[in-house]
A protein has these predicted regions:
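Entry/capping segment at the start of metal-dependent catalytic domains
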Residues: 1-8
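Conserved acidic
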Residues: 10-44, 49-430
Length: 430
């Protein structure tokens, strides 16, 4: 089918012999050359089966490879020709790797299953052929709809990444792998210790000792996933190896709330700590280029955003060139230290902390007329913090903020509602 869901060609072969109408499997190759095929999970199944069909394998042999692929065998002996172009709509669709049938259900489509058994050992009847074609046609229709939904958000951006990398071998890679290879063509040297600059510890002198000890333990075991929670600054704060979640323990409803977010926090930390070594300068130039073109060339900007944001995840990916567990732990700890310091400064300036997340702090002013405001106003704290941590904060403001906990809240600004969390986002107020 084409993008308009119109059937442009059908291929059928009982014994892979050449039919008079020229629609046997031997006709697939000349038809698909110079075209880009789109499928769902085709990088792991359909593409390989098509290659075998074009080789002229008998149905009995095709069935054996089918069973191997479905059984989890990658069949790496099946080589995809260099001219063969395809896109896989399943690529990076989500950590759950939903099946096509699951997506059809989520899209409100009917779940159509074939009544024709996959174990028939005889030629299909005309009626069975018709039903099989209808079954395949329906799944292709669903694949077309998925492709349309992901074209701009994923495939256009991936195409921009491929232009940046300029390597034909990368066409089937996911965006995370492409991003790593844009920055490096060799494995990143691994750190043998945490590398928090000594001058940063003075800003977190109120850090709970168990949290510090937990972080230091990661030096001997980078896979350590411990957590520690404590009530501090009138918030229940959880220290771990992710964000720094925390919420006010006294109230749930707040007025006139300000939110300071760290702009591009992980990319900024990666640059500050020179995590990528020689490639850090390249990384920084990509960050600066994205800021310049953010409102001019959105597609390229989105591609650069993927490169920038994928690095932190790749530091934890053992299959990536960027794999560096202690660097990952350092970036995480550095970010939590910076957020903890911002919380500390605001709290001691008599601001009420409301919500603390991975890269931001929501707070309110208890007493705008306090003498403290002459030298501890949040704007002064803001600029001092930026100077001390070499990162940038961005301000947002809300009229009302109502929260159940750190991950479930409703924030209202100028009559518009922002919601977060499973307890709130099922409601649509706008």
């Amino acid at each position: 089918k084409n993008i308009n869901n119109e059937v442009v060609r059908s291929f059928w072969s009982e014994d892979n012999e050449k039919f008079e109408d020229g629609n046997g499997f031997e006709q697939i190759e000349p038809f698909i050359k110079n075209k880009t095929l789109v499928g769902y999970n085709n990088y792991y199944y359909d593409d390989k089966m098509l290659v075998l069909m074009m080789r002229g394998l008998k149905p009995t042999d095709l069935h054996k490879f089918n069973d191997r692929l479905i059984g989890g065998d990658k069949c790496s002996d099946i080589k995809i020709p260099a001219w063969f172009k395809s896109l896989d709509c399943m690529q990076q669709i989500g950590v759950a790797h939903p099946s096509l049938k699951q997506i059809e259900g989520n899209m409100g489509m009917s779940i159509v299953e074939s009544e024709v058994s996959f174990t028939i050992d005889r030629p299909l009847t005309e009626e069975e052929k018709q039903e099989t074609c209808e079954y395949c046609s329906y799944d292709i229709q669903a694949t077309i709809e998925i492709f349309k939904l992901r074209k701009h958000s994923y495939f256009d951006t991936k195409e921009s990444l491929l232009k940046l990398y300029d390597n034909s071998k990368a066409a089937r890679w996911n965006t995370t792998t492409i991003s790593a290879n844009i920055l490096l063509d060799y494995p990143l040297p691994k750190w043998n210790r945490l590398q928090i600059p000594e001058d940063k510890w003075k800003h977190v002198d109120e850090l709970p000792t168990p949290a510090y000890e937990m972080w230091k333990y990661a030096e001997s075991d980078p896979t350590y996933k411990g957590t520690y929670s404590e009530e501090i600054f009138d918030c229940d704060i959880k220290f771990a190896f992710g964000g720094l979640p925390g919420e006010n323990v006294n109230e749930h409803w707040f007025e006139d709330v300000k939110l300071l977010d760290v702009a591009s926090m992980y990319p900024s930390i990666i640059i500050n700590l020179n995590v990528l070594g020689r490639a850090t300068n390249v990384y920084q130039s990509l960050k600066e280029e994205r800021l310049k073109i953010k409102h001019v060339d959105k597609q390229k900007s989105d591609a650069l955003k993927i490169v920038l944001n994928s690095v932190y995840g790749n530091l934890k990916n053992q299959y990536s060139l960027l794999f560096n567990p202690l660097a990952s732990a350092t970036v995480c700890i550095y970010g939590q230290m910076a957020l903890f310091d911002l919380c500390r400064r605001l709290y001691h300036a008599d601001y009420t902390l409301i919500n603390i997340n991975t890269d931001g702090v929501a707070f309110k002013d208890n007493d705008p007329n306090s003498p403290l405001r002459n030298f501890m106003d949040y704007e002064i704290i803001w600029k001092q913090w930026e100077q001390d941590w070499n990162m940038t904060l961005e301000l947002d403001e809300f009229d009302t903020w109502i929260q159940k906990d750190v991950n479930n809240y409703i924030a209202i600004k100028d009559g518009k509602v922002k919601v977060k969390g499973a307890e709130t986002n099922k409601y649509n107020f706008n």
